[in-house]
């Protein structure tokens, strides 16, 4: 008799995706972040669902409903902080996952890569809208500043902003629709994840060497299920350590002050995971230019497959490219630091130089360097 997991229509799909899936024998811990992102999404959906049961999306009661969750709901505080810090974990895994894709040339699977970029945009939109919901000072002013950027779009900008706001300022209508979108987007993200995996399983996984590994495959279970389980354990340990020992470490103290449209905080800044993009936005004095740079800072990932000039796929055997990659990582850390600083000397010029270097590295230096390495192969 055939095993049920190989014959049952539904079990068969799970079997081909998670059990009998042929996987390269040499994929390192950098390949763990895909499953960790799945775990993060699961944690966010479950904790978010429980928070939504007690949250009210009204400007008068939103802030106090979050306080009520933390004080009066059974284990409400841990659910709230798991959700808030779970978002940080989500972005740490996302950045490492994308970084792995760049380093090992996984972007050559262009369909999987492009769905991944869509996922990144969707997760960023979800996180932004979620940050508005507690209706603290930084929630309100963050929403005002970021949505106002759309007014830089010629001709339709002002109308577009008022349409998104549902009025002439960020108010009750804005909060209600942000809650609606924040609730629905994770399920859209889950659907996109399915498509992401569908395209990935069409080609199979890349590996650290960047060489086709069809001749040497191993079953996903038990080898990579146990490896993923270890990753899950480490992620949950890190998340719980953060939640139980310093839950507000990554938050902004301003968000413990209820939103006040009449008082602007001294430094308006987003959550830490948006600071690099915020620094790029601020580095350009022109409003429209800044908005374009902000969008391009993520959209630039889409041109990576087109800019791949190397004869080798992975950077594993390309020391000059490796050097440029780590300069790019250091540059992103610099941008993140600058994004959290006030707009004054010397931070302005450092931000402008770091923003220039970010685009210069990806668009010019890395492809040129790959061509030089191609020449060196012939020596």
UniProtKB/Swiss-Prot annotation:
Please list the residues that bind heme b b562: 83, 182
Gene3D superfamilies (alphabetical): Cytochrome Bc1 Complex, Chain C
| Primary location class | mitochondrion
Extract the CDD domains matched here. Answer: cytochrome_b_C, Cytochrome_b_N
Coiled coil (UniProt feature): none
Positions binding a ubiquinone in this chain are: 201
**Keywords (A to Z) from UniProt:** Electron transport, Heme, Iron, Membrane, Metal-binding, Mitochondrion, Mitochondrion inner membrane, Respiratory chain, Transmembrane, Transmembrane helix, Transport, Ubiquinone
Protein name in the entry: Cytochrome b
Which PANTHER family does the record match to this protein? Answer: CYTOCHROME B
Annotated GO molecular function terms are: metal ion binding; ubiquinol-cytochrome-c reductase activity
User: Any further remarks?
Assistant: Heme 1 (or BL or b562) is low-potential and absorbs at about 562 nm, and heme 2 (or BH or b566) is high-potential and absorbs at about 566 nm.
UniProt-annotated binding residues for heme b b566: 97, 196
Q: Give a GO biological-process term.
A: mitochondrial electron transport, ubiquinol to cytochrome c
Family membership, please give it: Belongs to the cytochrome b family.
Bilayer-spanning residue ranges: 33-53, 77-98, 113-133, 178-198, 226-246, 288-308, 320-340, 347-367
Q: Which function does this protein serve? A: Component of the ubiquinol-cytochrome c reductase complex (complex III or cytochrome b-c1 complex) that is part of the mitochondrial respiratory chain. The b-c1 complex mediates electron transfer from ubiquinol to cytochrome c. Contributes to the generation of a proton gradient across the mitochondrial membrane that is then used for ATP synthesis.
Q: Its quaternary structure?
A: The cytochrome bc1 complex contains 11 subunits: 3 respiratory subunits (MT-CYB, CYC1 and UQCRFS1), 2 core proteins (UQCRC1 and UQCRC2) and 6 low-molecular weight proteins (UQCRH/QCR6, UQCRB/QCR7, UQCRQ/QCR8, UQCR10/QCR9, UQCR11/QCR10 and a cleavage product of UQCRFS1). This cytochrome bc1 complex then forms a dimer.
Top-level taxon of the source organism? Eukaryota
Q: Return the Pfam families for the record.
A: Cytochrom_B_C (PF00032), Cytochrome_B (PF00033)
